[in-house]
């Protein structure tokens, strides 16, 4: 597990945490990342940790009432959130296994498929897993 104290500081007068990127990058090598371009939405990440592939999707908001990280009042709470996100990553043993999952997953049966960013993420991930545009 990641120790969030290496990613975030707890200081006098701290008004909270808002940036998920340190956590996202601490989980591994980001191969593809697509975020919604809005004040609230989802982040989708494909990891490639030396051939072990990870898939993470999580939502975020614009205030402490609708965003889990902004709602954290202590680093212990940030740690709990980080652990939950890390544990929610779906891991595949190989690119081939991940590619099969991406190609056969019922994306159309999911609410997230109706967002252009999800379609972009899926398409970029498939291209990456097929070996195309590995410099994404």
What are the roles of these predicted feature ranges?
Residues 2, 30-32, 124:
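Residue-level marker of intrinsically disordered, low-complexity segments enriched
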Residues 18-61:
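Amphipathic, interaction-prone secondary-structure segments
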Residues 70-136:
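Low-complexity intrinsically disordered segments
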Residues 60, 65-69:
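Short, His- and charge-rich active-site/binding loops that engage polyanionic ligands
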Residues 5, 50, 69, 135-136:
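Intrinsic disorder/low-complexity detector
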Residues 1-18:
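Charged, compositionally biased non-catalytic regions
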Residues 14-27, 34-35, 69-72, 76-82, ...:
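The transition from N-terminal targeting/processing segments to the mature protein
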